[in-house]
């Protein structure tokens, strides 16, 4: 008996940005790349058609085969590169439809194109970001943002804190919180990435990982105790290591993931190494969610100059994760 196709939902994000065109471009070879998957594109059908034409992509990919379009009408006409708060709720409606479908079991994974946070806020809806919204909608108390490269041994970087001002990071780090974060990373790398024994390297917070307390005590008072407790739970998490030396091949060779303490500690290295083909994964959710690792790129929208590599990688990772989860 042939297994049922994996069902992947794609939200096309901010209509003035590159999301609609990158979605169509990334799906050009979908039947060959992902023969066991079906893709549902959530967005305005006319917008997708127009943006595909603008960048020279084959619009026929949206008309059958492994790809279908779930039409959601724009609230106002969309023009490449020009934001309109009238479409803020449209963007959120796409995300809600994908989340609802995944929670109901209709989708095995969702892939999100970039959105503009300001547009949603300007529409009167308080919105911090995809990650926080997904956690709220799925009633998940703790999620973990992880960005990753591609290839046989990809660099993966997870974050202990996400969109926080730097002055608030230290207070946000707790022993229990770090243990929970490490447990989520360990579980999801096993279940959704097929890793039998994940190894996680953990950065310190302070320069030189605190220099034995002379440059800060978070490593001694919070991070090291969290690592000890995680070890008692069978989690292979090592550190804390100075972040300025950890990201070297000789350290990363045996690592499956790096846990950084804050956003701009871990992500610049990863984006430098992978930009254009990196992806974002939200760990800890009851559903699978991946996305591109870049923003709306308003200046590139409709020009054909935006690179679909990250969207292809996000789709590929979503399919891979869905295969593992279905088999688990």
Curated annotation (Swiss-Prot):
Its cofactor is Zn(2+); Mg(2+); Co(2+). Pathway: Cofactor biosynthesis; pyridoxine 5'-phosphate biosynthesis; pyridoxine 5'-phosphate from D-erythrose 4-phosphate: step 4/5. GO terms for cellular component: cytoplasm. InterPro entries: PdxA, PdxA_fam. GO terms for molecular function: 4-hydroxythreonine-4-phosphate dehydrogenase activity; cobalt ion binding; magnesium ion binding; NAD binding; zinc ion binding. Its EC number is 1.1.1.262. Gene3D superfamilies: Isopropylmalate Dehydrogenase. Homodimer. Catalyzes the NAD(P)-dependent oxidation of 4-(phosphooxy)-L-threonine (HTP) into 2-amino-3-oxo-4-(phosphooxy)butyric acid which spontaneously decarboxylates to form 3-amino-2-oxopropyl phosphate (AHAP). This is 4-hydroxythreonine-4-phosphate dehydrogenase.
